[in-house]
Design a protein with these regions (language model features):
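N-terminal secretory targeting modules
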Residues: 1-91, 281-308
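Alpha-helical scaffolding within the catalytic cores
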Residues: 75, 133-145, 182-191
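Conserved SGNH/GDSL esterase-like catalytic core that processes O-acyl groups on lipids
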Residues: 80-176
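Solvent-exposed, acidic/flexible segments
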Residues: 90, 94-102, 132, 144, ...
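Active-site-proximal beta-strand/loop segments in catalytic clefts of secreted hydrolases
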Residues: 93-96, 120-123, 153-158, 197, ...
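Sec-exported extracytoplasmic/periplasmic mature domains
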Residues: 106, 110, 114, 144-147, ...
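Active-site segments of SGNH/GDSL-like serine hydrolases
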Residues: 154-160, 164, 188-220
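Catalytic His-Asp segment of secreted/periplasmic serine-dependent ester chemistry enzymes
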Residues: 206-308
Length: 308
């Protein structure tokens, strides 16, 4: 081992040399990490992963900015202007409230001369209990047999309960319940569109007389609204303000004694709102003017139009 004045410097203090090498490796590693972070940030920004202008995102909205409404990625099916020669077949129904929607809407559709009503509803049915009544299968059958061009559907009254799915209960309100409920609603919407409906008007739940129901109705409405936004051609029809007072509380004058169902006046009020949505799409230039015939009997006409 050399010990004279000309011995190599590295042999004088090998520990110092190792420390310098370690520092250089750390600096190099830090530079590599920094470069990779910059590249990753650029790729995410180009992919739109940052969401809105502020780049915020949320797992709850699937990477979309908080509060953003999801948009369908395809344009809605084309519609035509409804005429007497080429009328629009409108299926209306759902649960018992959907039945009342149909009762109110049918006379208005018939009187228009350009819309043809088709009605069906099932009491006590809904999205949760397809072991009792399977709306998924029923809607497939309806689209195949009735072949409506437009659908006005209303259900959710009976969905303040757990979901039954192939022998397994999913407790109401849990994350898994919300996921399954949304999936069933979305599947039904897609069934209608795939079955030939060019427009689907999914009517939300109204405010209820029993206050405990309202948070649950709002949960259902929120899920339906979100799914409607994901399906081109589906419109969510909000009727909550329609049956509330000016200060947002329950308005009993339109409702039956159970605080859920509608009076005849309430049915007509609901039908007017849904009919307005139909006309906006299918009769943008207005309806043909009615020309009464000389031998028409007003009493007979009124009686015939009021029957579903």
């Amino acid at each position: 081992m050399e010990t004279g004045p000309y011995a190599p410097l590295r042999s004088r203090d090998p520990r110092r040399r190792r420390r310098r090498q370690a520092r250089r490796r750390l600096v190099l590693l830090a530079l590599v990490v920094l470069v990779l972070a910059v590249v990753a940030a650029v790729l995410v920004a180009r992919a739109g992963g940052g969401g809105g202008k502020d780049g915020s995102s949320s797992k709850a909205t699937g990477g979309k900015p908080a509060g953003a409404t999801p948009k369908p990625i395809t344009p809605p099916p084309k519609v035509w202007v409804a005429t007497k020669a080429d009328p629009v077949r409108v299926w209306a129904g759902g649960d018992s409230l959907g039945g009342e929607l149909g009762y109110g809407l049918a006379p208005v559709l018939e009187q228009s001369k350009v819309f043809m009503p088709i009605l069906y509803y099932k009491e006590s049915s809904g999205i949760c209990r397809w072991d009792f009544f399977d709306w998924g299968r029923k809607m497939t059958s309806i689209m195949h047999t009735a072949r409506p061009n437009a659908v006005a559907i209303m259900m959710g009254t009976n969905d303040t309960q757990s979901i039954w799915d192939n022998g397994v209960w999913t407790a109401y309100g849990k994350p898994a319940w919300k996921t399954k409920y949304a999936a069933r609603v979305g599947d039904m919407m897609q069934t209608m569109l795939d079955g030939g409906a060019r427009r689907v008007y999914w009517v939300g739940m109204p405010i209820m007389g029993e206050s405990w129901r309202n948070s649950r109705m709002k949960l259902i409405n929120g899920i339906v609204k979100e799914q409607a936004a994901l399906h081109a051609g589906v419109q969510y029809v909000d009727i909550w303000p329609l049956f509330a007072t000016a200060n947002g509380t329950y308005d009993a004058k339109w409702r039956a004694g159970d605080g859920v169902h509608l009076t005849v006046a309430g049915q007509e009020r609901l039908a007017k709102t849904v009919f307005a949505a139909l006309k906006k799409d299918w009769a943008p230039y207005g309806l043909p003017s009615a020309k009464p015939t000389p031998d028409a009997s007003p009493s007979v006409s009124a009686s015939a139009s009021s029957s579903p």
